[in-house]
Amino acid sequence: MNLVLASTSPRRKELLTHIGLGRAEFRFTQVAPDIDETPKAGELPRDYVQRLAAEKALAGLALCSGMSQPAVLGSDTIVVLENEILGKPVDEADAKRVLRALSGKAHTVMTAVALAKADQTSVRLVETLVRFCVLSDADIDAYVASQEPMDKAGSYGIQGLGGCFVESIEGSYSCVVGLPLVETRELLSEAGIR
């Protein structure tokens, strides 16, 4: 079976590499699926993130038509505060708005991971509770000026500079980064990929 990561995210690539535990035989390729990420009317956050992960995996599978036995991994991460999905910021002002909203509060990070093969698609959802410390305007301005939050759900990266805002987490750290390792390993193992 040929493993394919349906993502160009460097964070997901690095995390998936960890699953191989350094074994030379654990290899994968990457494709860049293009899907519409617009939430459907009335769609709950957990349904939305699972749908996107599955759609990314299936779109990736469609890009692998010439490959022998592809198994395509798709993933999506969202940040949810008070039942509102906080996606990637559209600009610096939006990033600042989101960071102000997260300041001093707990929010949920949801990451869904899907594995699509010719005959089936399996999805896992992982939720992690993240609590932010209180952020000053100077903290927010400096962080946004670093440009780190501009391509991240919820306008922060726990694995980078944004990690200094995280007071605590309850759940999977790798979920917050963008690919829950335990659940991804389970999906791969169930598919016979080790």
Swiss-Prot record:
GO terms for molecular function: dTTP diphosphatase activity; UTP diphosphatase activity. InterPro entries: ITPase-like_fam (IPR029001), Maf-like (IPR003697). It catalyses: dTTP + H2O = dTMP + diphosphate + H(+); UTP + H2O = UMP + diphosphate + H(+). GO terms for cellular component: cytoplasm. Its cofactor is a divalent metal cation. Keywords: Cytoplasm, Hydrolase, Nucleotide metabolism. It is found in: Cytoplasm. The record marks 11, 77, 159 as: Important for substrate specificity. GO terms for biological process: nucleotide metabolic process. It comes from the Bacteria. The active site is at residue 76. Its EC number is 3.6.1.9. Its main location: cytoplasm. Belongs to the Maf family. YhdE subfamily. Nucleoside triphosphate pyrophosphatase that hydrolyzes dTTP and UTP. May have a dual role in cell division arrest and in preventing the incorporation of modified nucleotides into cellular nucleic acids. This is dTTP/UTP pyrophosphatase.
